[in-house]
């Protein structure tokens, strides 16, 4: 009887731990936020890279889509090479999330521009030839895409 009670208690503890893990994941914690932090850290190391229209890498420069494509490719995710491609991007199962649920690491899309949400109403992007790649406040009303998680 004691062994059965102990086994039942262990099963209840496992179920409670699993429920807590699922609740944390639904609240934006867990692995998706950990990967989001990795995406942000990786993207931030490219601050200062020059803007080159049509560019695709940090050594020769990139445009906004080249930057986001390069960063997400590092994490094994494919993204379009043109901003217009995001109109059909709701392909591949990427999830559109409301601004109230955005998380660091989410891709941001505006007509003609993309960036990566870094948290605290900030994002990093390749802007233009005079600004290059830098982190700035979120502007306008972008679409947020959950690429990972």
Language-model region placement:
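Peptidoglycan cell-wall recognition and remodeling modules
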Residues: 27-149
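Hydrophobic packing segments in regular secondary structure
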Residues: 1-34
